[in-house]
From Swiss-Prot:
Binds 1 siroheme per subunit. Binds 1 [4Fe-4S] cluster per subunit. Its cofactor is siroheme; [4Fe-4S] cluster. It catalyses: hydrogen sulfide + 3 NADP(+) + 3 H2O = sulfite + 3 NADPH + 4 H(+). It comes from Escherichia coli O9:H4 (strain HS). InterPro entries: CysI, NiRdtase/SiRdtase_haem-b_fer, Nit/Sulf_reduc_fer-like_dom_sf, NO2/SO3_Rdtase_4Fe4S_dom, NO2/SO3_Rdtase_4Fe4S_prot, NO2/SO3_Rdtase_4Fe4S_sf, NO2/SO3_Rdtase_FeS/sirohaem_BS. One of its GO terms (molecular function) is sulfite reductase (NADPH) activity. Siroheme binds at C483. This is Sulfite reductase [NADPH] hemoprotein beta-component. Pfam families: NIR_SIR, NIR_SIR_ferr. PANTHER family: SULFITE REDUCTASE [NADPH] SUBUNIT BETA, SULFITE REDUCTASE [NADPH] SUBUNIT BETA-RELATED. [4Fe-4S] cluster binds at C434, C440, C479, C483. One of its GO terms (biological process) is hydrogen sulfide biosynthetic process.
Amino acid sequence: MSEKHPGPLVVEGKLTDAERMKLESNYLRGTIAEDLNDGLTGGFKGDNFLLIRFHGMYQQDDRDIRAERAEQKLEPRHAMLLRCRLPGGVITTKQWQAIDKFAGENTIYGSIRLTNRQTFQFHGILKKNVKPVHQMLHSVGLDALATANDMNRNVLCTSNPYESQLHAEAYEWAKKISEHLLPRTRAYAEIWLDQEKVATTDEEPILGQTYLPRKFKTTVVIPPQNDIDLHANDMNFVAIAENGKLVGFNLLVGGGLSIEHGNKKTYARTASEFGYLPLEHTLAVAEAVVTTQRDWGNRTDRKNAKTKYTLERVGVETFKAEVERRAGIKFEPIRPYEFTGRGDRIGWVKGIDDKWHLTLFIENGRILDYPGRPLKTGLLEIAKIHKGDFRITANQNLIIAGVPESEKAKIEKIAKESGLMNAVTPQRENSMACVSFPTCPLAMAEAERFLPSFIDNIDNLMAKHGVSDEHIVMRVTGCPNGCGRAMLAEVGLVGKAPGRYNLHLGGNRIGTRIPRMYKENITEPEILASLDELIGRWAKEREAGEGFGDFTVRAGIIRPVLDPARDLWD
């Protein structure tokens, strides 16, 4: 993409304030421990507001009541979001019971939110419950270390219940990569788990004293499923198997979706193929990619700091050669692989180990007891009797994994009685939104609360045009940071202002093409009017098996994005 315009390896200039904050934090300690005891405010002050992100938390407030509280001369109702570190999304039933209890007793909203990063979040943790939540997680073998800010975030792994042996091997690598790239500072253990301060000096041999320039996301992918959306991530290991056994990985680097409205220096980007590596080099290569980005990433501008921008600035071949040098290997040519879809297989699937796996559709990943649909209670009851584990998917759904034939009926009965197996349309199964309002401070428009009724309307359009048995990969994200992964959807809505979105078209079903903006700053009725016409055309004019996104490109409705660094904004 960018060999024509290689730029400097290191960007000179004044460092951002985030770099100062990290340097002065004493390896992420700051004054968080002291701040915990300050009862005058429900939030964290100064640098601690940002430092807690390295410990897996974001400070938020309820935006629905922000103005009302301001009128009453009250500070915003501060509460923390906590995101668990859960490589590959696998969680034991014992762990599930513990998080269910905490969510019900110690959060404002009482819910568990499954995320498209294959983990769960608690929303609405008051300051007094912040230390207890970390201690609860630790008591069941979990933590929230490095699930936010400038680190390698939660490592994703394809939730593939068919190929159980291959999934087991890939999952082990996801865990190994996660552990290898964790920060070494003892700050987390000292602050949250009351572990003794050790006299030795902290060192961060991989991440460095100021950690990474920006967030960094990693996946392990098992083709033909691209459920984890590899092109949204900085570093991707695509599993290559021979005779059902994992032998190595294709490496793809430099994906990412975050943009800024109107800032043409920002762009979504698909990941670049570097080559194939045998298994034994996996950790060395992972470390080499991370340290290259650590040293070459832009620390003068956080909006231009992610790996995708580093690749474009220095050139893919230059970055790749540096990874080879640091890892002491030469990449082999990419091995053949292909993707056929991204969705989860809802319902029962039999694995090759004679165990059954039940994938439950959880709309927007929000687990709560609703009237007539006690989802949270139902999952708790299943957790009490299920001998296998649960797996959170990157589509915000939940797999009850490893169910023996003898237990199927019992688990299905609870799931059905709890509304966990209610029939939904293919369109709803393939739609997703980020959290957005009321808790996300960056939200510009509704997403999670908007999606269910929006999909009701889309379902009506699909029925009107005779394509109810089909689906379009459709996603809503409340702001251009892109947590809802709308910039890899066939139809992506990106929040612009309350009730208004940019409509993007032209992505594809398998998630390998960035969609282009079709209409800007439009309302739901305008979106539906556009989609009514386009779905009608797709229903009539498509070729056999042609997805909606591919159709919009072939029919000339939208120009495909071929090189997003140069043509996304054209």
